[in-house]
Amino acid sequence: MIVGLIGVVEKISALEVHIEVQGVVYGVQVSMRTAALLEAGQKARLKILQVIKEDAHLLYGFLEEGEKILFERLLKINGVGGRIALAILSSFSPNEFESIIATKEVKRLQQVPGIGKKLADKIMVDLIGFFIQDENRPARNEVFLALESLGFKSAEINQVLKTLKPNLSIEAAIKEALQQLRS
């Protein structure tokens, strides 16, 4: 599994960059925001999410871990694929998107190409509680994703996350949350 690439940017287009890594050129899907920050001929370091489908092997690249975490969470929403998730990240920074979800600005979300009222409402409902307002937010979001991947519902996870001690490591938080969820 590819989780990161460090190499020279060969080509940049709106939603894809080509990165040469020791003689191999990788096509990586990126948001327009990420593409705008990269320069052809310059070295780049991207965090990668590799998605393997029946008909395609896709690499999605991110400059920031927060973008990658948000992208992974968006992919878990029924009706949101890589194209729409990248459109969201192209339109809003993770902080802007968090604000849109927190203030329930459905109309702003509908401005993203490919998102209608129904999907915007679904995204709002599915992401309520995903963005936790504290200094441990990135760790909490990782715990949320881990528990969700184990099949727990968002509402259950949010209840348990509220009870966890704030300075737990990710591993300790997952362990404690699992104990609470299974009891």
From Swiss-Prot:
It holds the Pfam family RuvA_C. Has three domains with a flexible linker between the domains II and III and assumes an 'L' shape. Domain III is highly mobile and contacts RuvB. This is Holliday junction branch migration complex subunit RuvA. InterPro entries: DNA_helicase_Holl-junc_RuvA_I, Hlx-hairpin-Hlx_DNA-bd_motif, NA-bd_OB-fold, RuvA, RuvA_2-like, RuvA_C, RuvA_C_sf. The keyword DNA damage applies. Homotetramer. Forms an RuvA(8)-RuvB(12)-Holliday junction (HJ) complex. HJ DNA is sandwiched between 2 RuvA tetramers; dsDNA enters through RuvA and exits via RuvB. An RuvB hexamer assembles on each DNA strand where it exits the tetramer. Each RuvB hexamer is contacted by two RuvA subunits (via domain III) on 2 adjacent RuvB subunits; this complex drives branch migration. In the full resolvosome a probable DNA-RuvA(4)-RuvB(12)-RuvC(2) complex forms which resolves the HJ. It is found in: Cytoplasm. Keywords: Cytoplasm, DNA damage, DNA recombination, DNA repair, DNA-binding. The gene is ruvA. Residues 139-183 are annotated as: Domain III.
